[in-house]
């Protein structure tokens, strides 16, 4: 959430920055500043009213002791009137602030200066590529046909049990899933990330804190009876561990990793982009989350990008790293780098990770702060990234490593799978 101070002092800067995200903020910013002016004026009036009320109330006892009942009664009447007025101001202030807050949450985070301009994914900038694209033999198959051929993923059974987008992994397919999760977690913990196992349902405050609510409410599964939400990513519960926390100056860096199943409605998805594992309603993902001092968050972002790149490269998958343009960025991000792997049988790039710096945007919503070296309370910066999302990794592994009679497993995974190939 953007700060009122920033909106009040630099409204044109905010409007120009959000235009990079193709977001027209002028009307909202102008309304916010009017409401903010009202908020401050009402608070000043309320403070004066309460101070006068306290001053008058203190006079009553002395007047009564002096036997000045009529004067005391007159002051009591004044106090009662001031009390009524303060109540009216408080009610007006609550209504004003409610409208103010409802508008504040509609503003996305500002993109940082490194974000390129652009409207769609076509405008994203490729900053690096690695590993060669394999040349497959004749009669190569997409992963959904390979899954059926080797009986490792059953999409039809998932439809029977739940619906489309909920596959059932079987045999070596299930073991490959488990191997990838354990490999990713081990690689993350080896560089200092603390493993946590969070709930996969969160309350509304958690969804609001990381910015999924209200922006992505329509894409989240909502258990309405208890008002809980299934997590779309481990980012939500893990980052919220530090909601309403004030860290010490020496508590940094905070580095956490978690595996969770993730749940997304993905309403409106259709066509080739959703075949097989390309887009699911339930999928497995390992996440890394960091909390940093503002002056150290971009160095942390570079570390996270390098770590995710090392993970992807170790699997032998052809990959590319993209810096997202303003129009393709998420609501909460200040900058995002996407990792994509090449799916040889489909002949297309598949996103497997996003690594983002949110600067203080989430921290402001979370009330996640720290005391600096001078003891001053400041907002922290939050970052997260997928390390990695499994479905498209599996799709690319199956397709790129297929032979006529088997699918070879990358060497780094063999200690985890217990087998060298799927046949």
Where are these regions (language model features)?
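TRNA-recognition modules of translation machinery and tRNA-sensing kinases, especially anticodon-binding
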Residues: 26, 129-423
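N-terminal alpha-helical targeting/anchoring segments
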Residues: 1-134, 152, 156
């Amino acid at each position: 959430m953007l700060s009122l101070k920033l909106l009040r002092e630099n409204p044109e800067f905010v409007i120009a920055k959000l235009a990079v995200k193709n977001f027209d903020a002028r009307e909202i910013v102008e309304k916010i500043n009017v409401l903010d002016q009202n908020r401050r004026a009402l608070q000043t009036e309320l403070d004066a009213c309460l101070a006068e009320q306290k001053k008058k109330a203190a006079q009553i006892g002395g007047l009564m002791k002096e036997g000045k009942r009529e004067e005391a009664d007159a002051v009591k009447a004044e106090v009662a009137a001031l009390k009524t007025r303060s109540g009216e101001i408080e009610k007006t202030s609550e209504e004003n602030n409610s409208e103010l807050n409802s508008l504040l949450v509609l503003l996305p985070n500002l993109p940082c200066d490194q974000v390129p301009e652009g409207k769609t994914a076509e405008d994203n900038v490729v900053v690096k590529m690695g590993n060669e694209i394999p040349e497959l033999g004749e009669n190569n198959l997409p992963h959904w046909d390979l899954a059926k051929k080797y009986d490792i993923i059953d999409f039809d059974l998932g439809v029977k049990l739940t619906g489309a987008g909920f596959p059932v992994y079987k045999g070596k397919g299930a073991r490959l899933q488990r191997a990838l999760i354990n490999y990713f977690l081990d690689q993350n913990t080896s560089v200092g990330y603390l493993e946590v196992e969070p709930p996969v349902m969160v309350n509304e405050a958690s969804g609001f804190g990381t910015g999924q609510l209200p922006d992505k409410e329509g894409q989240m599964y909502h258990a309405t009876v208890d008002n809980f939400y299934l997590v779309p990513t481990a980012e939500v519960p893990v980052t919220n561990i530090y909601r309403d926390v004030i860290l010490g100056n020496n508590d940094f860096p905070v580095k956490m990793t978690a595996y969770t199943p993730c749940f997304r409605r993905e309403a409106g998805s259709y066509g080739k982009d959703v075949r097989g594992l390309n887009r699911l309603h339930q999928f497995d993902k390992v996440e890394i989350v960091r909390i940093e001092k503002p002056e150290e968050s971009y160095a942390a972002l570079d570390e996270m990008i390098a770590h995710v790149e090392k993970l992807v490269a170790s699997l032998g998958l052809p990959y590319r790293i993209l810096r997202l343009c303003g129009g393709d960025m998420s609501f909460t991000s200040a900058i995002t780098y996407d990792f994509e792997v090449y799916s040889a049988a489909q002949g297309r790039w598949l996103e497997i990770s996003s690594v983002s710096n949110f600067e203080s945007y989430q921290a402001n919503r979370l009330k996640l702060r720290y005391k600096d070296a001078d003891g001053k309370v400041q907002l922290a910066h939050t970052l997260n990234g997928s390390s990695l999302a499994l479905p498209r990794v599996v799709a690319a592994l199956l397709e790129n490593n297929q032979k006529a009679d088997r699918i070879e497993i990358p060497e780094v995974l063999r200690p985890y799978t217990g087998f060298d190939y799927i046949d």
